């Protein structure tokens, strides 16, 4: 787990890391956020699912500089959240989010991106 400088974390952040979780500089993480970089095995051939091995080869999580993660967000393995993006409250991040985007929902999807020429957020 690598946490950059100027990161602000409120209460109840859970990070489950078997590979690599990297949080860039000046990231804001709201309450009750869950980050995991692996999956639990799901073979029905074992006695119970608890006995399945972890799939630690899935891939890490990267949260780039200046990102804002809202309350109750879940971030799943093998994703990058691009620089200065915003992830709305209650979202489940299952795939990477481009830089300078706003993503919401389950699964999280981009609803806005920042237009540097117009200097405004544009709806997608």
What is each stretch, according to the model?
Residues 78-109, 116, 120-122:
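C-terminal/domain-terminus segments
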Residues 1-79, 114-115, 120-121:
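Flexible, glycine/small-residue-enriched loop-and-beta-strand segment within the central core
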């Amino acid at each position: 787990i690598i946490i950059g400088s100027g990161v602000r974390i409120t209460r109840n952040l859970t990070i489950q890391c078997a590979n690599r979780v990297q949080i860039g500089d000046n990231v804001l993480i709201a309450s009750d956020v869950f980050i995991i970089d692996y999956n639990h095995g799901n073979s029905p051939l074992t006695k119970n699912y608890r006995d399945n091995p972890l799939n630690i080869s899935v891939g890490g999580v990267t949260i780039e500089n200046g990102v804002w993660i809202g309350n109750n967000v879940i971030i799943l393995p093998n994703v990058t959240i691009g620089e200065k993006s915003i992830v709305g409250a209650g979202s489940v991040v299952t795939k990477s989010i481009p830089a300078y985007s706003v993503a919401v929902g389950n699964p999280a999807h981009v609803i806005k991106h920042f237009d540097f020429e117009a200097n405004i957020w544009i709806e997608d």
